[in-house]
UniProtKB/Swiss-Prot annotation:
Similarity comment: Belongs to the cytochrome P450 family.
Cofactor section: heme
Enzyme Commission no: 1.-.-.-
InterPro entries: Cyt_P450 (IPR001128), Cyt_P450_E_grp-IV (IPR002403), Cyt_P450_sf (IPR036396)
Protein name as it appears in the record: Cytochrome P450 monooxygenase idtP
Disruption phenotype: Abolishes the production of all paspalitrems, but accumulates paspaline.
Record: residues binding heme: C439
Biological processes, Gene Ontology terms: secondary metabolic process
Species classification: Eukaryota, Fungi, Dikarya, Ascomycota, Pezizomycotina
Gene3D superfamilies linked: Cytochrome P450 (1.10.630.10)
Main function: Cytochrome P450 monooxygenase; part of the gene cluster that mediates the biosynthesis of paspalitrems, indole-diterpene (IDT) mycotoxins that are potent tremorgens in mammals. The geranylgeranyl diphosphate (GGPP) synthase idtG is proposed to catalyze the first step in IDT biosynthesis via catalysis of a series of iterative condensations of isopentenyl diphosphate (IPP) with dimethylallyl diphosphate (DMAPP), geranyl diphosphate (GPP), and farnesyl diphosphate (FPP), to form GGPP.
GO molecular function terms attached to this record: heme binding; iron ion binding; monooxygenase activity; oxidoreductase activity, acting on paired donors, with incorporation or reduction of molecular oxygen
Enzyme class: oxidoreductase
């Protein structure tokens, strides 16, 4: 790893001098730096990942109502104020490009994520979301099976009387993988244990690779893949998963007149409009990429954050259990879309958890494609990457009263339940994005998180392994990303209602 960092420094120096003239546009924007002005800017780029959260907070505090610039390893990031959001949310993708921004943010040159069209968005918006009432039973059936597989029978027996140590992140990742696989590739693949274990490991290695790449920079990481364990592993895992999905695509095309599957892969096959979108390889890559990144891992992180928020608050857990019993009079397997909507207290806790512990500092990442002049005369130039400092805005006391305090029922106090729901995108709930390109899968994610948490509340008591440990397990911060701890052990025990 030391050699990799030396190479990173050399590459960053070369990139800095080659690209310095190309970064003149927007030079009137104030730059938030860690190092004094007499030091070269490449030092700020090298140290961005170690102090990004502090830099964002400083920039937001000093320039709340005007843009400021951050110096990242791969490019400059122009952080724009919330006042521009309403103007920009209506702009089209040929003016503000969300796909390339997501591609860059996910180290697309290394991981192959994400993709070069909006096919996955169309599949989610036109097929998945309208079908949610009918999809929920399949998700619940798979989660019921998944809980039996993820918590082995021997552990299940011990759980009846004893506390059993479980890694909550790994548990939730496996549950999410199994449930999402049912909806994305269907049976029999979703019950293939090798596929499931490989998919979960693939998700972990993708994020480990992104973590490494943000330290080394996007310029040299693609050339050092053979030296990075997570890169080698996820390429091998992706090849296996892709071949399995390719076989399923071939089977479906050969039996196209039979009963068609009703899953994400099939929807993409039917909605593909170009030759490039229709190729089996592109369909497989899109399905695997969205399954791993947009659904499984983000749902797993949000659910783990939520478990950690509840772990030191027995009163909150009991309050949520009471709601579950009131809403689910037919038991956990009786969950429907309506009962999901009736879980208003859980929904409030989910939204508050995401407000305090989001997946990252920013939302609304875009690459500027055309010159844009905003209403106050501020100009955006082609090639600039922009974002909104969502975490800072949503924890700003001037925007939200008592913003630094975690108040689980904060959103129950609001008048309009629809506008304060977990999956509702708004200026006060920025982490799903804004406008026409807000996260299309947020409704599915909401239901999956609720279903998993509901089962945990119904069936288990849980606490930190170390009884002396107090409070919430700390987050892991890397650059502008926020992760729940993946190493914390939580003790679970089966509940026995009196």
């Amino acid at each position: 790893m030391f050699l990799l960092h030396i190479l990173a420094i050399g590459a960053c120096l070369l990139w800095y001098f080659v690209r310095s003239d190309k970064r003149k546009q927007g030079s009137n924007i104030p730059t938030i730096r860690r190092w004094p002005a007499l030091f070269p800017e490449f030092l700020d780029r090298l140290s961005y990942n170690s102090c990004a959260a502090r830099l964002v907070e400083n920039g937001y505090r000093e320039h709340k109502d005007r843009p400021f610039r951050l110096l990242k390893m791969d490019m400059d990031l122009v952080v724009i104020p919330l006042k521009y959001a309403q103007e920009m949310r209506a702009l089209t993708s040929d003016e503000l490009d969300p796909l390339t921004a997501v591609f860059d943010d996910n180290v697309g040159k290394v991981t192959g994520i994400l993709l070069d069209s909006q096919l996955h968005t169309h599949a989610i918006q036109r097929r998945l979301t309208p079908r949610l009432p009918n999809i929920i039973p399949a998700m619940m059936d798979e989660l019921n099976y998944a809980f039996q597989q993820v918590i082995p029978s021997e552990a299940g027996e011990r759980l009846q009387t004893s506390w059993v140590p479980i890694n909550p992140y790994d548990m939730v990742l496996e549950l999410s993988t199994r449930a999402a696989a049912r909806l994305f590739v269907g049976e029999p693949i979703c019950r293939d244990e090798v596929f499931l274990k490989t998919s979960a490991a693939y998700s972990r290695n993708i994020f480990d690779t992104i973590h490494v790449s943000r330290s080394l920079g996007h310029i040299i990481t693609p050339y050092l893949g053979s030296l990075i364990p997570s890169v080698r592993q996820f390429h091998q895992q992706f090849e296996y998963i892709q071949n399995l999905v390719l076989g399923e695509i071939a089977h479906r095309k050969q039996h196209s007149e039979d009963n068609k599957a009703d899953d994400f892969l099939q929807w993409c096959m039917e909605l593909a409009r170009t030759k490039e979108e229709s190729t089996p390889t592109a369909l497989a890559q899109r399905t695997v990429g969205i399954l791993s990144m947009a659904v499984v891992h983000t749902s797993a992180m949000a659910t783990t954050h939520l478990l950690f928020d509840m772990i030191s608050n027995q009163e909150l857990r009991e309050q949520l259990r009471t709601e579950q019993k009131q809403v689910l009079k037919q038991g956990w397997m009786g969950i429907t879309q309506q009962t999901m909507l009736d879980m208003k207290q859980l929904d409030s806790v989910m939204r508050e958890s995401q407000r305090i512990n989001p997946v990252g500092e920013f939302t609304f990442r875009r690459i500027v494609r055309k010159p844009i002049t905003l209403s106050d005369g501020f100009q955006l130039h082609p090639g600039q990457q922009i974002a909104i400092a969502a975490r800072c805005i949503n924890t700003d006391g001037d925007v939200l009263p008592d913003a630094e305090t975690f108040k689980p029922m904060r959103w129950m106090e609001k008048e309009s339940a629809a506008s304060t729901g977990f999956a509702h995108s708004s200026d006060s709930n920025l982490h799903f994005g804004l406008g026409r390109y807000a996260c299309p899968g947020r409704f599915l994610a909401s239901y999956m998180i609720k279903a998993i948490i509901s089962r945990v509340l119904f069936d288990y008591e849980f606490k930190l392994q170390d009884d002396s440990a107090a409070g919430r397990p700390p987050n892991l911060i890397h650059g502008d990303k926020i992760f729940p701890s993946r190493d914390v052990t939580v003790l679970f025990r089966r509940r026995h209602d009196e």
